[in-house]
């Protein structure tokens, strides 16, 4: 895909690159940093849940503002600047309540950026929304570079390098957002239905439930996977490479998803994704001592995150059109990464503390099985859906 006058490919890709590089540090290694501060599993689960919980309200609030002002790019810029300065306060104190305060304040603004940027990207792409994956793949590459690099740095220096690296990356995010052009707004010449009437559609409600359950199932993974591997003898560099492997599989999928979606349809691929995700959690639960099986489980990240995310972004974009686009993407972030992620992280903290790692991942698999049933029952094929089947 080449850059054109209407699609600023490299500037959009650059934001994804650096934004997800920050996640390549935050997601795998922040729990290790919290563990180094002598927080227990319940406290770590709570602190990670705070980051997720702000996604319940923040994206939708900022999405509402963006939809009513048309200033989505300005919101992304302000949110990025405030995120940088608030996160810098993490160096003031290592107390639980201070870290909790900083995480809540920082993530309220940080979580405002991505949903608005997703909507901007879709607007830039126009009718070529299936090319989204060609831009989003740069985010995966940024994640890989960060997770491998920081895993290596931790072994050389110490886990204390994590917050320093994050602050540097947040600064680079600020630079990237000031290189971005404003997106083209889709003008609506006819009256639209209310956003509530869109949400009340059975297929949309089912999709929301499935998104919640899928991200809930990731609670143990995002919160404790690095600690889990470390407790079973894996080195920091190995942990970094395993995270990178999962995202590399995601990258390969993103390169072909624009061909796969039209060919197989959203419903079939969604069911396949959920089945593979349940398998992934069971493999991690029972075969952590086998590096080859853990290797295989990480390859399934292509399904549990990559494929699911591509399907969800596509469906929310098509159901929430025109003036609802910003809030549509925000709703996806709120119910999945927000509510699902927060409840999953919080639950995993208590589950890990009192029932252990195996039970925690088994519960994750059960949640995905419920999502599979909901999808099979309520998300049906509908012909004429932009020449694709749902």
Identify what each model region corresponds to.
Residues 74-88, 167, 268-283:
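Structural signature of the two symmetry-related core transmembrane helices
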Residues 161-178, 359-378:
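Symmetry-related core transmembrane helices of the 12-TM Major Facilitator Superfamily/SLC fold
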Residues 57-71, 154-155, 252-266, 352:
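Helix-to-loop junctions at the C-terminal end of transmembrane segments
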């Amino acid at each position: 895909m080449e850059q054109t006058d209407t699609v600023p490919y490299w500037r959009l890709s650059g934001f994804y690159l650096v934004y997800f590089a920050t996640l390549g540090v935050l997601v795998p290694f922040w729990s290790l940093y919290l563990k180094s501060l002598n927080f227990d599993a319940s406290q770590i689960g709570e602190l990670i849940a705070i980051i997720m919980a702000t996604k319940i309200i923040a994206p939708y609030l900022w999405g509402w503002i963006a939809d009513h002002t048309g200033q989505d790019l300005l919101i992304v810029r302000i949110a990025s600047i405030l995120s940088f300065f608030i996160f810098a306060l993490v160096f003031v104190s290592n107390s639980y309540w201070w870290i909790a305060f900083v995480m809540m304040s920082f993530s309220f603004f940080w979580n405002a950026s991505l949903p608005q940027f997703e909507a901007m990207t879709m607007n830039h792409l126009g009718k070529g929304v299936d090319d989204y994956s060609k831009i989003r793949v740069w985010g995966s590459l940024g994640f890989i570079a960060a997770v491998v690099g920081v895993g290596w740095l931790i072994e050389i220096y110490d886990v204390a390098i994590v917050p320093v690296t994050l602050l540097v990356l947040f600064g680079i995010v600020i630079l990237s957002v000031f290189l971005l052009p404003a997106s083209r707004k889709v003008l609506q010449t006819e009256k639209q239905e209310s956003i509530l009437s869109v949400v009340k559609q059975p297929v949309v409600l089912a999709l929301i439930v499935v998104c919640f359950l899928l991200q809930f199932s990731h609670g143990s993974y995002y919160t404790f996977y690095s600690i889990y591997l470390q407790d079973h003898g894996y080195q920091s560099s190995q942990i970094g490479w395993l995270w990178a492997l999962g995202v590399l599989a995601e990258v390969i999928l993103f390169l072909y998803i624009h061909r796969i979606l039209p060919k197989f349809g959203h419903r079939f691929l969604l069911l396949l994704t959920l089945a593979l995700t349940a398998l992934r959690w069971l493999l991690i639960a029972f075969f952590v001592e086998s590096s080859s099986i853990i290797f295989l489980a990480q390859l399934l990240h292509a399904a549990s995150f990559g494929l699911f995310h591509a399907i969800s972004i596509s469906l929310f974009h098509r159901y929430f059109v025109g003036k609802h686009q910003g809030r549509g993407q925000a709703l996806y972030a709120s119910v999945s990464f927000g509510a699902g992620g927060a409840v999953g992280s919080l639950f995993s903290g208590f589950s890990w503390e009192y029932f252990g790692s195996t039970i925690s991942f088994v519960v994750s698999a059960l949640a995905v099985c419920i999502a599979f049933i909901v999808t099979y029952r309520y998300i049906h094929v509908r012909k004429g859906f932009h020449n694709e089947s749902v």
